[in-house]
Structures are given as structure tokens and as C-alpha cells.
Regions:
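Assembly/oligomerization scaffold segments
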Residues: 1-95, 200, 232-243, 252, ...
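Short beta-strands and strand-coil junctions in structured, solvent-facing domains, enriched
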Residues: 48-49, 125, 159-163, 236
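Surface-exposed, non-catalytic interaction/assembly patches
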Residues: 98-110, 149-152, 175-223, 240, ...
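Short beta-strand-centered interaction patches in the first periplasmic/extracellular domains
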Residues: 2, 85-94, 128-197
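Hydrophobic alpha-helical segments and helix pairs
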Residues: 84-126
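Low-complexity, intrinsically disordered Gly/Pro/Thr-rich segments
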Residues: 216, 225-238
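Short, charged beta-turn/beta-strand-edge "cap" motif at the junction between a beta-strand
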Residues: 63-69, 220-227
Length: 256
């Protein structure tokens, strides 16, 4: 990836038949703890009312330069009851699980049996589940819960804490996408600032859209050095068009 892309990237938003790269301010949030990734696209007054969209229209947000873009989110428009023509709210496929209602009883079941049923009800076919043996329950009952709450209840009932989320439109439970290479975040290079707030470090970086939560990255900084797991990322633009990225990870005061 060229330095020019990293230093002065551009957002490209596709909603239905529209492709927008100007007149927008963008904020994207991704976290394995919150399950659902989202992106808010604020439209300039010139665009408000001109861009027509409806609930569940397919939408993507990409960041890059010229013809080299990486996807930040690939999901659907969520329209509420407010002035939604002023902004476009995009959420990933977890929105399907949030909107489906589960009422079912499962006999002699493993957690994977329940999750596969929930995914089928939500119309989700691409998934990778942990193949670990967590044991069976004689009876497991769900009474009118959303798909997200049902999967959370599976974790709670079996006493496990498997993260679950979507990446590149694939659902993961207790697993994650295979990582082919590890990226290095360096002081004086990709890292602009590094500070700790509570249990998490916040690394303000140049825009690196191919880094996502649950990936491992190597941090090389005078305040902290080591291999860490990304907990969440925030990418946003300001009214000048500048792009800011924040990468969060857990770690001690120093590991140098």
C-alpha cells in the first residue's frame, strides 16, 4: 500500500445505485464486544434530499486512494423515524440477527445446534463456528428473543464467552478469520499518538483500513511494545476532509 493512500485517503460510499465520495463526513465503529459494526455518513446540505435510500438497501463504505480501496463495512441501510435524509446509518449483517425473533425449544442440543438454527432464521448462510465440544443440554428454550440475544443466551447458559461478529459478511462464533500477515504500528511512523484510558490503549494512527478488530498487530512504541489483539477501531473524517483512525487494545503500562 502506498504512503499516499495512507496519508490522504478518501471515503467511497455506495448506497443502492449511488456512489458518493464528496460532500460527506463519515464515522465508522467496529468492536468485537458490541457485536454490530456501524457507520454514520452525514450528508452535506447540497446532498440532503438528493440521495434516495430506504431501509435495508445494500451499502458499503470503503477507504483508500484512486483505485485502491479497502472495505470498512459492508452491510445495509438502517432508517429510523427521525430526519434520516440528513445522514445514512449503515450496519453490518448483525442487523439481520437483531431483527429476527426466535421462539423455539431445543432437545438434546449443543450450542452450535442453536446458533445454526438462529442463523438460518435470519437468512445467514456464510458462517464459521467453533468446533469445540461444549457439551449438550437436555432442553434449551428461547421465548421471543432477538437473534443477538439468543446467541448471547447460548454463551451464558453453556458458561462460555465466545465472541461473535461479522467480518466480510461472514459470521464468526468463537473463531475469527485466518490472519495471513501481522501489521506493525510504529512510533514516528504509523502511530501519531498513544495514550491509555482505563484498561485500553488508544493508538491514533494514519488511516489503515485493512486493520480490523480481533486481529493481532505488533506495537513498537516507547510507551508500549508487544503483540496485541485489536479490541475495536474507529475511523472518522472531519469537516476539512481529514481522516483520523483510532485503534484500541489492552495491555500493561509497558511491555518493552
Amino acid at each position: 500500500m502506498g504512503n499516499k493512500k495512507l496519508i490522504s485517503p478518501e471515503f467511497r460510499v455506495t448506497v443502492g445505485d449511488y456512489e458518493i465520495s464528496e460532500g460527506i463526513e463519515v464515522e465508522c465503529f467496529s468492536s468485537k464486544e458490541s457485536h454490530m459494526d456501524w457507520c454514520r455518513v452525514e450528508l452535506s446540505p447540497q446532498l440532503q434530499g438528493l440521495i434516495q435510500f430506504k431501509d435495508m438497501d445494500e451499502a458499503t463504505v470503503e477507504l483508500g486512494y484512486e483505485d485502491d480501496f479497502d472495505s470498512l463495512i459492508d452491510g445495509y441501510v438502517r432508517c429510523g423515524d427521525g430526519d434520516y435524509w440528513k445522514e445514512i446509518m449503515i450496519k453490518d449483517d448483525m442487523m439481520k440477527l437483531d431483527r429476527v425473533t426466535i421462539k423455539a425449544s431445543f432437545v438434546d442440543c449443543e450450542p452450535q445446534d442453536v446458533i445454526r438454527y438462529v442463523l438460518a432464521c435470519a437468512g445467514i448462510e456464510d458462517y464459521i463456528l467453533s468446533d469445540e465440544n461444549y457439551g449438550k443440554k437436555d432442553l434449551f428454550v428461547i421465548d421471543k428473543r432477538s437473534g443477538i440475544k439468543t446467541i448471547a443466551e447460548v454463551n451464558s447458559s453453556w458458561g462460555i464467552s465466545n465472541p461473535f461478529f461479522f467480518q466480510k459478511k461472514v459470521f464468526y462464533w468463537g473463531t475469527k478469520e485466518d490472519q495471513k500477515e501481522m501489521y506493525v504500528l510504529e512510533e514516528g511512523g504509523t502511530i501519531l499518538a498513544l495514550n491509555k484510558y482505563g484498561d485500553l490503549w488508544e493508538a491514533e494512527t494514519i488511516a489503515i483500513p485493512w486493520i480490523h478488530h480481533s486481529q493481532e498487530v505488533e506495537v513498537q512504541h516507547s510507551k508500549y511494545s508487544g503483540i496485541v489483539t485489536v479490541e475495536k477501531t474507529i475511523v472518522r473524517s472531519d469537516d476539512t476532509g481529514a481522516v483520523h483512525m483510532y485503534i484500541y487494545f489492552a495491555g500493561g503500562e509497558q511491555d518493552v
